[in-house]
From Swiss-Prot:
It comes from Rhodopseudomonas palustris (strain ATCC BAA-98 / CGA009). Belongs to the ABC transporter superfamily. Phosphonates importer (TC 3.A.1.9.1) family. It comes from the Bacteria. The complex is composed of two ATP-binding proteins (PhnC), two transmembrane proteins (PhnE) and a solute-binding protein (PhnD). One of its GO terms (cellular component) is plasma membrane. Gene3D superfamilies: P-loop containing nucleotide triphosphate hydrolases (3.40.50.300). This is Phosphonates import ATP-binding protein PhnC 2. Keywords: ATP-binding, Cell inner membrane, Cell membrane, Membrane, Nucleotide-binding, Phosphonate transport, Translocase, Transport. SUPFAM superfamilies: P-loop containing nucleoside triphosphate hydrolases (SSF52540). Its EC number is 7.3.2.2. It catalyses: phosphonate(out) + ATP + H2O = phosphonate(in) + ADP + phosphate + H(+). Residues 24-264 form the ABC transporter domain. It is an enzyme of class 7 (translocase).
Length: 284
């Protein structure tokens, strides 16, 4: 049976959703690349106003799952349902959904000669336009200023990004995503290039934004300690299968060592688990 993109209600209204609701749910998803199956029968849900971390070793399908959620990768089988945002095969609907999704990458690709606020405004630009300051309307500049204020950088709005620290540039990247007023915020290893203290600070920013703005935040992380510290929920992938799905507080060092022996900070010498045929641990 092929993949099914489920019809949804009209786009929008996320800020009226209960914090306990799930914005996104995937059921029985499999993704293949050539003859290799990258994700095997994955089922997971992603709640509104919460931060979900997707963790696991390299090559287990974390980034593939992110590509699935932003509509860039089509599954071979399974269903994808969005409470308020739908990814459909019809191009117009897909574009509408992408307008409500923002992705933050490790390489935030700012333009050093532009100010922080001009870099943020580029989040609104049509990619066909030149990457240079445009005569933005007042309303757009107000939105950019608010986005910078949300990440604590309003005082540096006119400073060129080449003059900012690494952490400040990362915040500009977050603000550029926020100016689009997304309902879904995705991050692919967004803290890989910053030190642990700054990563925790930025992680706290994501949690605050999720709660205050009603965002569904999904982060791919390889730092397991950081995932426990900043996420509300953790999904652990092993060989393309869900090995853990539950509250971050339940993902303790012992469980981490059992599921991810190669990544675990614990030096437990118990034998590693075999490839999971099903979810090892799911805690609601």
């Amino acid at each position: 049976m092929g993949a099914e993109w489920l019809p949804v209600r009209k786009l929008g209204m996320v800020r009226g959703i209960s914090p306990d609701s799930n914005l996104i749910r995937i059921d029985g998803i499999s993704v293949r690349r050539g003859h290799r199956t990258v994700l095997h029968d994955v089922t997971a849900s992603f709640p509104t106003a919460k931060v979900t971390a997707i963790v696991g070793p390299s090559g287990v399908g974390k980034t593939t799952m992110l590509g699935l959620l932003n509509g860039l990768i089509a599954p071979a089988s399974g269903t994808v349902s969005f409470s308020e945002i739908g990814l459909l095969t019809e191009p117009t609907a897909l574009r509408a959904a992408r307008h409500q999704t923002a992705t933050i990458f490790q390489d935030h690709a700012l333009i050093g000669r532009l100010s922080a606020i001009d870099n943020v405004l580029l989040g609104l630009a049509d990619t066909r336009h030149p990457l240079s300051p445009l005569p933005w309307p007042v309303a757009a500049r107000q939105r950019a200023a608010k986005a910078l204020d949300d990440v604590g950088l309003l005082d540096l709005a006119t400073r060129r990004t080449a003059q900012l620290s690494g952490g400040e540039r990362q915040r500009v990247g977050v603000a550029r995503a926020l100016i689009r007023r997304p309902k879904l915020l995705l991050g692919d290893e967004p803290f890989a290039s910053v030190d642990p203290a700054l990563a925790q600070q930025l992680g706290g920013l994501f949690r605050s934004l999720a709660m205050r703005e009603g965002l569904t935040v999904i982060l791919v992380l390889h730092q397991l300690q950081l995932a426990r510290a900043i996420a509300d929920r953790i999904i652990g992938l092993s060989d393309g299968r869900v090995a853990f799905d539950g509250p971050a507080a339940a993902f303790d060092a012992d469980l981490e060592a059992r599921i991810f022996p190669s990544l675990a900070l614990s030096h437990d010498h118990s034998p590693p688990l075999s490839q999971p045929k099903e979810t090892i641990c799911s805690i609601d």
